[in-house]
């Protein structure tokens, strides 16, 4: 019985010490205290470039969501048509916003360069800018499959 009572006494003392210790410790604040305005480097608007001049970056990113089927077919089947809206979004993100964002969408840097190169090649307003594909340091390794499309409808005989 003596060992049981000494165990309980030790347990109570340790518990009491932990409670006292935890009451004297202060936790760090979850957010930095702000003095009127937040610093430019910690501001969410600054980090996401959400000022009035870069709203088109987010619009372009949303546009890429709508043309993801075209981009997948471009690489998967070798279908060589990407619409002008999709190309505009690719150029905007690659040149004016976040060049690495195309990689975040699941494409490699080489595939992003290929998309930009394709869109630059079809851009009539290129203004003499270098093509992203031509300036890429990565070797091309995408082999497109040739597909034959056959019409299943037979011509009608009068």
From Swiss-Prot:
InterPro entries: EC11-15 (IPR044711), Prolamin-like (IPR008502). Keywords: Cytoplasmic vesicle, Fertilization, Glycoprotein, Secreted, Signal. Transmembrane segments: none annotated. Glycans are attached at residue 122. One of its GO terms (cellular component) is vesicle. The keyword Zinc does not apply. It is found in: Cytoplasmic vesicle; Secreted. Restricted to female reproductive tissues, specifically accumulating in storage vesicles of the unfertilized egg cell. Residues 1-27 form the signal peptide. Pfam families: Prolamin_like (PF05617). The keyword Heme does not apply. GO terms for biological process: double fertilization forming a zygote and endosperm; regulation of double fertilization forming a zygote and endosperm; regulation of protein localization to cell surface; sperm capacitation. Belongs to the plant egg cell-secreted peptide family. PANTHER family: EGG CELL-SECRETED PROTEIN 1.5. Involved in the regulation of gamete interactions during the double fertilization and to prevent multiple-pollen tube attraction; mediates the redistribution of the gamete fusogen HAP2/GCS1 to the cell surface after secretion upon sperm arrival. This is Egg cell-secreted protein 1.1. It comes from Arabidopsis thaliana (Mouse-ear cress).
